[in-house]
């Protein structure tokens, strides 16, 4: 079996920045209330000139540039998203915008765990030798599905995209040292973007369901309890699987959902606060975009260096959660 090399990163966010003070003009809230409970100061929201597809393509192009690849060399594009521009899939459109005509492209939906699930999925194609190069993109435009009059949820989410270019390599240079993935549909009702339907007449005496989607629904307390229990647990299992001591981890890269969750997970793992990567203050929760967006930012500013060990975990709706132990081997700063 081959190994996987992480070769380049990219990111894209909308131009429009919505601060906590801006939101306080629409709902009863304040900068202090939001920061204290979430760690978020602002979020980016796509306007009418931007889309999930355009953000994903921009992030993907940058990852290819940083990896030094021509788009024609990519065999696979996986787009992790829960908010596609087209329910039939947005990855093929991203493929066209990038110019990766030789790549098979498809969407993978696993909410805020989506990027990590997609990275692991893409890696399996490369490990077997079926493919050589893959582009994994995490992108969401959840602003389309937020109830902007619900102060419990509208303060949390933003739009954004991140991408990582990976390629097959000799097993001894493997950059995906281990992973674990979990799902539990029995607990899924605490975080939903659920279908709605209404009866519509099709023919006399015959009807069908006309569909749509309700705004994001969330039981914040249950989501918090789920995250602070399962994220440290799955990371501890992964570190045990790979015979890795927490002290040897250079960076903890978690899904950027809430600063309280990041802090609690790090404390339970015994990982120092200065090893916890966070950009929640600037972007909020971009769902499948958070991990690659944070990775790219830390690579670009020189925090993450080639050869460093990264413990990562994604978690969210489904419920779904996973963890991966990564070694960065792409360009930095």
UniProtKB/Swiss-Prot annotation:
Active site residues according to the UniProt entry: 112, 255, 285
Entry EC no(s): 2.3.1.180
Cellular localisation: Cytoplasm
Pathway(s) it belongs to: Lipid metabolism; fatty acid biosynthesis
Keywords for this protein: Acyltransferase, Cytoplasm, Fatty acid biosynthesis, Fatty acid metabolism, Lipid biosynthesis, Lipid metabolism, Multifunctional enzyme, Transferase
CC per GO annotation: cytoplasm
Reactions listed under catalytic activity: malonyl-[ACP] + acetyl-CoA + H(+) = 3-oxobutanoyl-[ACP] + CO2 + CoA
GO molecular function terms attached to this record: 3-oxoacyl-[acyl-carrier-protein] synthase activity; beta-ketoacyl-acyl-carrier-protein synthase III activity
UniProt keyword Lyase, yes or no: no
Region (ACP-binding): 256-260
CDD domains per UniProt: KAS_III
Family according to the record: Belongs to the thiolase-like superfamily. FabH family.
Function (record text): Catalyzes the condensation reaction of fatty acid synthesis by the addition to an acyl acceptor of two carbons from malonyl-ACP. Catalyzes the first condensation reaction which initiates fatty acid synthesis and may therefore play a role in governing the total rate of fatty acid production. Possesses both acetoacetyl-ACP synthase and acetyl transacylase activities. Its substrate specificity determines the biosynthesis of branched-chain and/or straight-chain of fatty acids.
Entry comment, domain topic: The last Arg residue of the ACP-binding site is essential for the weak association between ACP/AcpP and FabH.
Subunit architecture: Homodimer.
PANTHER family tied to this protein: 3-OXOACYL-[ACYL-CARRIER-PROTEIN] SYNTHASE, BETA-KETOACYL-[ACYL-CARRIER-PROTEIN] SYNTHASE III, CHLOROPLASTIC
Protein name: Beta-ketoacyl-[acyl-carrier-protein] synthase III
